[in-house]
Amino acid sequence: MTPEHLPTEQYEAQLAEKVVRLQTMMAPFAAPVPEVFRSPVSHYRMRAEFRLWHDGDDLYHIIFDQQTRSRIRVDSFPAASALINQLMTAMLEGVRNNPVLRQKLFQIDYLTTLSNQAVVSVLYHKKLDDAWREQAEALRDALRAQGLNVHLIGRATKTKIELDQDYIDERLPVGGREMIYRQVENSFTQPNAAMNIQMLEWALDVTKGATGDLLELYCGNGNFSLALARNFDRVLATEIAKPSVAAAQYNIAANHIDNVQIIRMAAEEFTQAMNGVRQFNRLQGIDLHSYQCETIFVDPPRSGLDSETEKMVQAYPRILYISCNPETLCRNLETLSQTHNVTRLALFDQFPYTHHMECGVLLTRK
């Protein structure tokens, strides 16, 4: 695979290899046959980051080869959304012959939605002044005149200039309802929107008929907790990043959801609070013990669950675990399988044509 060519004819074979690999990894835990969710074969990535290479009068996007670190020119990127591909061309056309916008420009980040909105961040090794803002506003207006619904952000050391806003609103059909998700520049969002819809609908399916409340750790912008709120009496969710918490609060209001409470704290801190080890001012007014959480949802970083959180989640009858790293999932399952059985398993092909796998498991207490 190269950045400008996807081996789409090999899609089914690469997916079959992942299925076999996941089944092998999960065999020690008596997991069921995985439910397999396919990605679109192209234009599936909703965000992308590129370095910029200045070559005389020419200017182009590059990425670095992960093995050799050699640079690879990228004029089109079929893994990314059609909107990103349009913007890649339009941005370079607008910047290439503009000294104010081009000088010291070293990176462009693109974030797009299925609702056809975009935030483009341009990163510089220089101070951004009024002249830059004037030229950037002219570029933004020119892009919009081409029918591109785009917001521009300038970044430099200790500087962030939003010409309008630093977010876009995604709209996803999930289980027969349209969900609105505010996505903030430079914050985590699911990269493959089509796969995200399938992940949300799978999570809805496996929690159908659930009783009691839901606890979610690492909730981000509320991606899962808001979609799952319809299946539970109440949802209590934690997240550490301020922009993500603010986006989650917006999303609660935008979706007219009244049974979700977001707490800004790390999973490790929440574990301490639940165990009575520490008290937190952020929890004033929230009676943790009034929640009857019979299901816990975790979507941890690649490092998986730490040992204390492992112990904490074992206290819940049902554990729903979304993993972007099956190796750390299996490490966690060595502990979790002592008290719980794996009753559902899913493979989500979030990153086609790569080694990476995303998977989901539902564990129920023995």
Swiss-Prot record:
The keyword Endoplasmic reticulum does not apply. Pfam families: tRNA_U5-meth_tr. One of its GO terms (molecular function) is rRNA binding. SUPFAM superfamilies: S-adenosyl-L-methionine-dependent methyltransferases (SSF53335). It is an enzyme of class 2 (transferase). The active site is at residues 324, 358. Belongs to the class I-like SAM-binding methyltransferase superfamily. RNA M5U methyltransferase family. TrmA subfamily. HAMAP family: RNA_methyltr_TrmA. This is tRNA/tmRNA (uracil-C(5))-methyltransferase. It comes from Klebsiella pneumoniae subsp. pneumoniae (strain ATCC 700721 / MGH 78578). The gene is trmA.
